[in-house]
Amino acid sequence: MKILLAVVFVLNLTNLAVPQHLITSSPSLPESKPVGRRPTYEEYKQQRESFLQTEDHHLLGANVTLTENEQLVNKFIMQMKLDEMEKGFNDSYNFIPARHIFEVLDRFGQSKVFNVIRRLPKGGVLHAHDMALGSTDLIVNATYLENLWQKGNFGLNHGPEFKFSRERPGKEWSLVSEIRQWMTNEVYDAKVAEVFSLYNADPLNAYKSLDNVWSKFQNLFACLAPLITFAPVWRQYYHDSLKQFYDDHVQYLEFRGVLPEVYDLDGKVYSAEEIVQLYYEETEQFKAKYPDFIGVKFIYAPGRYASDEEFQKLLDTTNRLHKKFPNFLAGFDLVGQEDPGRSLFEFAPALLKLPASINFFFHAGETNWYGMKTDQNLVDAVLLGTKRIGHGFAVLKHPKVLKEIKRRQICIEINPISNQVLKLVQDQRNHPAALLFSDNYPVVVSSDDPSFGRSTPLSHDFYVAFTGIASAKQDWRWLKQLALNSIEYSAMNSEEKTVAKEKWNQAWDHQFSRLAVDFVAGKILENWIMKIV
């Protein structure tokens, strides 16, 4: 009986009218195509060679032509580079760019490639910050000056307060000169160097997260400010920082500055205009002393935590500086940790009211997040008309931004060591800049805050980018292209760029002639030693 009912039910269903719009035709299978033959091995090899050649033609530096001396040096340096990379390929733990820089700082000097890069004229640094330009030694030197007072002790994660004053600021303050007497200069210097650095011998355990290291970073600035913003120190620190960049064969600098309150013993607090005037005067004096130095431009870059009311005051300052220093002021940016900070979209209504003659150089995408307000700063930076992008670490997650960067020639300022120290990347071989290097994007390599990582103004960053991020195939043409890019994508006008290229070319040709002689002499000596051993 149950079987009979089931049959009747099914028969009834077949008589139901099904609405025509619910009837879908079965997807047709694709027509089978004749199976082609596989290529022969010789054909495969030809296709492979053509494929790789096409990739090579897209590499950053592929369009650079080397002189005879450069070709000679290139041959030697590529032998050195490939030797280091081959050793790293067989033992990646001992490959410098694969490790945290704090773990291998003492090994850079053992690298032949690094020692050559140190001698290389690297053009300019387009991404650096005012209170992190010079080495920690410059800060230590400042603590020997008279009238410096200290409040509190050196802690594990914080430092004492400092202040220059003719009179004792309060009962809890002590003269640093007196503290040095009972602590000894050697011990005190070591304490200062430790406080004003992010360096830690065990960085992976010392800094568990990006927020941990940013917290130390911000505490460092808070402790440093009253010490370094004393007017005589501020001036000397800037001058000595320029000398350190110059000694690292950096001929040009564009740096961001927050314009903090600079003060003197008479109680004067310098205005924004007076601080920029100080920068300008010191720069001109430095250029007069070192004629092959190209120059400096300043990017006003206050913090991104400002309220709407505070932000308007910052823009008013920007307008005043632009009018008084139309050539020395390169433009405007916002600094500070992006993730907790306000987004560019929030500031856009006010930013769009600035005159078009004020250029933007926005930090954007300094984050590991995707689809959040931080990486979307990249979109806003492009739409706001930024001339360059600071870091752009998340740019690979935004393909349209990548297209616009190429179309508009928006340069990305890559800071590999800073990205590692601030926990964005652990192994430089995984740095997203590898893609930018592989397809000739507009890029420069800079150093961000070299002093806090105990690295050189640019050589350490160039080295890890050259051996760890760039292709094993990328050679001196890559290095030369980066140096040229630092001039091309700078804020200099066309006349200034012409002069800059002349000065850089002279330095480059001179160094390459010396390197060629040294390499040939070294090779002859090596062969002679091999014969007598």
Swiss-Prot record:
Signal sequence coordinates: 1-19
What cofactor(s) does the depicted protein rely on?
A: Zn(2+)
Q: Name one Pfam family in it.
A: A_deaminase
Q: Name one GO molecular function term.
A: adenosine deaminase activity
Provide the top EC class: hydrolase
| Task performed by this protein | Catalyzes the deamination of adenosine to inosine and deoxyadenosine to deoxyinosine. Induces degranulation of host mast cells, and secretion of tryptase and IL6. Modulates enzymatic activities of human tryptase and chymase. Induces release of cytokines, such as IL1B, IL6, TNF, CCL2, IFN-beta (INFB1) and ISG15, from host monocytes and macrophages. Activates host NF-kappa-B signaling pathway in TAK1/MAP3K7-dependent manner.
* Name of protein: Adenosine deaminase
Which organism does this sequence originate in? Aedes albopictus (Asian tiger mosquito)
